[in-house]
Amino acid sequence: MEILKLPVGIENFEDIRRSGFYYIDKTMLIEQTLNNWSKVTLFTRPRRFGKTLGMSMLRSFFEIGTDKSLFDGLYISQNKSLCDEHMGKYPVIFISLKDVEGLSYDEAFQVFSRIIGNEISKFSFLAESDKLTVLEKEQFKGLLHIEKGKFIFDKDTFTASLKLLSQLLYKHYGQKVVILIDEYDVPLDKAYQNGYYHEMVSLIRGLFGQALKTNDYLQFAILTGCLRISKESIFTGLNNFEVVSIMDSMYDECFGFTDKEVQEILKYFNLSEHYADIREWYDGYHFGNTDIYCPWDVIRYCKSLCADPTAKPQDFWSNSSGNALVRSFIDKADVQTKDEIERLIAGEYIEKEISQELTYDEIDKSIANLWSVLFTTGYLTKQGVTDDGRVRLSIPNREIKNLFIKKIREWFSDTTANDGKTLEQFCNAFLDKDTEKIEQLFGDYLWNTISLSLIHISEPTRHLR
């Protein structure tokens, strides 16, 4: 029997199923989505936890003309009545916004236009459909205005595009549309970083408002992202809108790998002897009521072990991003926060109020907001909830502890490079009898001293269960 391959970086469900890759069955997501039906559902999970692959699987299941054999032998195939009713029954609009970025709004809008235009182009048969009127065919053609190889939209046409496409698909098929939007919050993140946040909020609010709120041709929609952006920001007025976060028990096994799934993949590739290392380095996340491993880490490390049985665990997840959020957090830390970071690195937990609804321009306005974002994006995890609703936070595993220590080391290196300036400030503060400045500088000195010991911590992070 052919040995299946490890799907490193492959996010297309059909490719995995057709090309001999190992697949951890997450088709319970389909069943739970239909049984817990909402008009619009948003799943928030950290990056590299299988969101895009999950969305690709949903498209393969619901899309008219799908190859039903892709689901042979998978969990969902056991629910015959559900498959008969829903598999291959809907027109599906699927867009991923993970590449929508630019140094300016105009650059980002052009990328966004290309993504929308490419999806519309997949339904080019609508231009000749005998189910559409002459006017409707012209409306479709009006969505595909191309100049010099680029899709051209004015803002009004852009924001109406998904709703109009839904209407035309409904007219052609006689069936309402499923809309899937992957990584919905990436354009907002990039816009905030590059100074055009409010323009992007306005654009996405208009697009989502028409596609998800006032769309009579929508069966249901599913969105994924890392953060839950405040409903008042871009989801204004959406009814029957459900957000499923890492705090919720529903769908808690649908993204990321469970302990059982990790043991199965290790057994399949004869790597079971490495279970303890994988658990120490890549386990520790708690979604709802389930312990979860980072799938990106597990697959990458298994791939390394298959090539070299002596390979050591690496920081795969943390090295897939710049992790500027952690450095920003350390830069802004006050004395209390620095003490809390020390406790986290020592394997303890801290208790914090978590806000699950923020806007990007609120994230770094306070340390409290940064705690919330570190939790939501996977740098911290939940150990429990207090009676008054505060969340017990801890560093999930060895990999993330290494990341915090690395960022503290960078901060320490940068600040000690300015020791001469700091000493001068300290002396001036004494001469000026500026007690507040003296306290701040002395606190920073203590943090530097403590940092020297923190960056040499090497014992494994304790799992607090």
Question: Would you name each region that the model predicts?
Answer:
Residues 455-465:
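Single conserved hydrophobic/aromatic residue that forms the stacking wall/gate
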Residues 1-454:
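Phosphate-binding site recognition
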